[in-house]
Amino acid sequence: MRFDECNFVTEMDEYCRQEFLKRIRDYDDSIAPTMRQNGYKRVDATERTVLFTFGEITFSRNRWRRGQKTLYPVDEWLGLEKYMRYSPELIFHMAKHASKLSYREVCRTICDAYRIGVTKDAVLKATKVVGQLLEEKERYRFYLEEEQPPQRIKASKIYLEGDGVMVKTTSSGNERSNTDLTHFLVHTGVKQVTKDRWILKNKHEIVHVNHEKAKEELLDYLYNHFEITDQTILITNSDNGKGYTKRTFQEIKKALGIKRHEHFWDEYHLNQKIKTFFKPYPEMLYNLAQKAIQTHKKPLLITVLDTVESLIETKEQYETYFSFRQKMIRNFKDTKPAKLRNLSHKGLGVMESQHRKITYRMKHRGMYWSIKGACTMAKMILLERIDQLEQLFFGDWRKSYQPYQNQRFSAGRANKKIKEPPKIRRYRSGHKTGRWLTHVK
């Protein structure tokens, strides 16, 4: 008779259930003397049904009372709060799957892999838990009595790229619109891991629905994680779109106190722009324009553009030409190739590939997000890709945060709680100039 794997899995599931129930009984018995010693009296035993990663379990646990206070030691041991239907581990698993799959696909995956049924609303609630944890972790920073500053990265070059990711969102009035997610990427170069594979060193990504907050978070990270010296070079790359121009990165350079800054007009976007513009004109002009860029000869580019102007026949063509000419001449310095700046091109222009993990999950397929939900999902995707989502759920910071969890956060209360100011710099935008002002607290 052939081995029945399905039947074996069913038997193992039942064995796990019985073993779990036994451990609950053992824990209840072991904690009883401690509860009595602390003045609690056992009232009764009540049942509860919870979905775990190993199945749906109905179990009975003791209820203890001291005065008006009631405790369920088993619930605390399992990390279960009042009315909690899903275990913390299962919530984490749902959130992890949701960073890669649609909510309905997560339900199917959980059903196939875990042999339990969850709803798409449960998956949605799991992502909301992530949003809440992200807020708590950010809030927790201001309650620290003592903080060990992170070990600063010593790097001669800091690479920084920025771009936006457009996603479809809905407002409270069910109005649909497009929202731009701000995405910044920081790294210190590339490292070869196999013959044909390279990875970014010290990679860190920041994403937010608010452009200003993303920039503040970026500066906060750079100040606290990098050792800036007179030899540090800030190498930036972008498509020069709104919010990601050279001026934006120059403000960062000034705030960091970096002396040398090299900004690149992203090669992919630049080539696409040139190719699109020269499509109606002779191919020779396109080749000469590319040569002007590769050799960084501005007079040659101006000659090519003057030749194009002589071929213009309509007003629409002239408007397109004038806009293109202005942008090319104004930003020509940013088109200088890396090799002519004595820099390596490796590690430049990687933002589009870093976008994919977000766009594959959040764009197309008719998906719409709330503003808050879009921000949470994008951050969740980034955490999952660097294996930090589990730390958000079960890291030591959560235990340290518990004493402050129910306290209202304010500057005055924070000052009372913090004996010594944490060695963290915080930033805000200048009211008139729009430039960042640093505040060490």
Which ranges hold each PLM region?
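Catalytic center-proximal scaffold of phosphoryl-transfer enzymes
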Residues: 1-21, 64-441
